UniProtKB/Swiss-Prot annotation:
GO terms for biological process: translation. Part of the 50S ribosomal subunit. SUPFAM superfamilies: Ribosomal protein L22 (SSF54843). This is Large ribosomal subunit protein uL22.
Length: 129
């Protein structure tokens, strides 16, 4: 095991929300998270609401949690928030056996993911991407 990483310190104009052990592969989750990076939170919520991906609802809940943290814990203006960072990490991989023909068995791997969303309050005009 390696040395534990020091967690990133939030600035005064930032808020964070983390969703851990989400039942989706990191690759699939990253497709949805890439849609909202750098966008204003209103545009990002609209994009997630109309996304057809299964995991978009969980990402939307995590983004709403980050917005609520910004408003309640950090006293930030929610109308001027952007998604500053959104990244995906690997979690556990649960292994299961799948019974096959002729007395054989194969392994099924069910990956899990972690999701971190950091929103930042901006004062200058930022274009919605």
């Amino acid at each position: 095991m390696g040395k534990a990483k020091v967690p990133r310190q939030l600035k005064d104009n930032e808020a964070k929300a983390v969703a851990r052990t989400i039942r989706v592969s990191p690759q699939k989750l990253n497709l949805v998270v890439a849609m909202i990076r750098g966008k204003r939170v209103g545009v990002a919520l609209a994009d997630l609401a109309f996304s057809r991906k299964r995991i978009a609802g969980t990402v939307k809940k995590t983004l709403e949690s980050a917005i609520a943290n910004a408003e309640n814990n950090h006293d930030l203006d929610i109308d001027s928030l952007i998604v500053a960072e959104a990244y995906v990490g690997k979690s556990v991989v649960v292994k299961r056996f799948h019974v096959r023909g002729r007395g054989r068995a194969s392994r099924i791997e069910r990956p899990f993911s972690h999701l971190t969303i950091i929103v930042r309050e901006v004062t200058e005009k930022v274009e919605a991407a």
